[in-house]
Amino acid sequence: MLTLTQLVTPNPDVAITLTLFLTAEERCRSRHRFETEDGQVVFLRLPRGTLLQDGDILQDETNGNLIRIAAKPEPVLTAVAQTQLLLMRAAYHLGNRHVPVEITPTYLRLSPDTVLRTMLEHMGLEITAEILPFQPELGAYGHHHPH
């Protein structure tokens, strides 16, 4: 069993013991028990409010293991628009609903929701249901990383 207690600065020269695949929602948990695909138990015991991102490195309480966090593929809706203005309008409306959204210059990505899908389609966006890593914005008041 591993207990992960601190976020460390990424270093490409360190040996990673394990990669832990977590959904966007799971990456918001600072204290939780996870089980890896091979059955290994991993506990997160991080400072309250810690938000993990794809590529973050965590260290266990013995300082002997480094674990990389990876965004786990999960069901998402990807929205694309004919114009950037339409995409910005859609981002505005999703933000008004406090919906976690991954924002890029060419698409918006959100968790599946039939009401939001219908709203976006009525606005003229093309929606595709996919299974991909989801990396929503942390928000203006989100956790700040040292990297």
UniProtKB/Swiss-Prot annotation:
SMART domains per record: UreE_N
Entry keyword set: Chaperone, Cytoplasm, Nickel, Nickel insertion
NCBIfam families: PRK13261.1-1
Superkingdom of origin: Bacteria
Entry-linked HAMAP family: UreE
GO cellular component, one term: cytoplasm
GO biological process: protein folding; protein-containing complex assembly; urea metabolic process
Family: Belongs to the UreE family.
Principal subcellular localisation of the protein: cytoplasm
Protein name: Urease accessory protein UreE
Cytoplasm recorded as keyword: yes
MF-aspect GO terms: nickel cation binding; unfolded protein binding
Job of this protein: Involved in urease metallocenter assembly. Binds nickel. Probably functions as a nickel donor during metallocenter assembly.
Source organism per UniProt: Nostoc sp. (strain PCC 7120 / SAG 25.82 / UTEX 2576)
